[in-house]
A protein has these predicted regions:
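Cross-family detector of peptidyl-prolyl cis-trans isomerase
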Residues: 1-128
Length: 128
């Protein structure tokens, strides 16, 4: 847990990031052209890659023919926090503390209490 906190503190101190009070850290990689943000009830198309702190990829849409489709409120809280700040076409790198990811639960390749890193591209808001 201390490693996670030190990792996030290091990311929060980097230039050009948005470090939120809840511990989520966001870096905008690309600016999209969209004008609206998705709401918690919105359905969105996204491309993403999820990594552990050591860089191990545990999930990705790379190589898939279509982006993934999700309702924002059905995602882990860290994703919800990031997505409602995005516009269509935006690409963010988001560091999510364990409490806004899977917490004490172990999920497949993700150990309990893991800080996660996601590259998220909001391709389209299908339903606001």
């Amino acid at each position: 847990k201390a490693d996670n906190e030190a990792f996030l503190a290091g990311k929060a101190a980097e230039e050009g990031v948005l470090a939120l009070d809840n511990g989520v850290v966001i870096r905008k990689l690309e600016q999209g052209r969209g004008k609206v943000h998705p709401a918690p009830g919105s359905v969105v198309y996204v491309n993403y890659t999820g990594r552990l702190m050591d860089g191990t990829v545990f999930d990705s849409t790379d190589g898939q023919a279509l982006p993934a489709l999700f309702r924002v409120r059905d995602l882990i809280m860290g994703w919800q926090i990031a997505l409602v700040r995005m516009h269509e076409g935006d690409k963010f790198r988001v560091w999510i503390p364990a409490k806004y990811a899977y917490g004490s639960a172990k999920m497949d390749m993700i150990p309990a209490w893991s800080t996660l890193e996601f590259d998220i591209e909001l391709v389209k808001i299908a339903q606001i």
